[in-house]
């Protein structure tokens, strides 16, 4: 056994990109630095890579609670592929390898965003899509795919947790807020 990568605070979702050995991770970053720090992220995992925890984050940004510690690591911190809202609580992720959705979805990442618990304005509570543009590389962008788990008064009625591609090509999403499993099917435009 050996350490493959380090400095990843909380890699909750871990998935291998189909037909490759490339690992991707959805990470819940650190808390207690306010509403807007530190962003959660989704990224491919570089063999031997260092992702900053606990001293650094998002490249060369030092956690103020560790000011002046380990300056030699600053330039080793890998910047993630896709930066999410802080406290989104990105949990499980999957690569879409089904055939039910349009062709442009194949190979893309779908991730469940469980939602914030420690932020003044709620974020997350959705399923997102990270387009890989048939190249296997993320552009840094993501889009909302399944939303509506927070109603106008701020009440949360659903929290996506697990996600997988079903044998028919639909997506299955577990939800520990409504105690449900959702099936997302494509029925055409």
Stretch-by-stretch model annotation:
Residues 1-5:
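Conserved small/polar residues in nucleotide/adenosyl-binding loops
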């Amino acid at each position: 056994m050996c350490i493959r990568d380090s400095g990843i605070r909380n890699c909750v979702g871990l998935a291998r990109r189909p037909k490759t050995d490339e690992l991707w991770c959805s990470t819940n970053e650190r808390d207690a630095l306010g509403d807007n720090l530190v962003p959660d992220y989704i990224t491919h995992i570089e063999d031997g890579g260092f992702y900053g925890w606990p001293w650094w984050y998002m490249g060369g940004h030092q956690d103020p609670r560790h000011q002046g510690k380990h300056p030699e690591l600053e330039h080793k911190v890998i910047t993630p592929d896709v930066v999410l809202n802080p406290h989104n609580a990105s949990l499980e992720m999957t690569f879409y390898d089904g055939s039910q959705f349009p062709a442009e979805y194949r190979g893309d990442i779908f991730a469940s965003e469980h939602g914030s618990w420690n932020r003044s304005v709620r974020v997350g509570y959705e399923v997102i899509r990270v387009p890989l543009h048939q190249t296997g590389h993320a552009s840094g962008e993501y889009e909302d795919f399944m939303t509506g788990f927070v109603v106008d008064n701020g009440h949360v009625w659903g929290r996506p947790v697990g996600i997988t591609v079903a044998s028919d090509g639909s997506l299955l999403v577990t939800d520990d807020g409504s105690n449900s499993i959702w099936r997302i099917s494509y029925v055409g435009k």
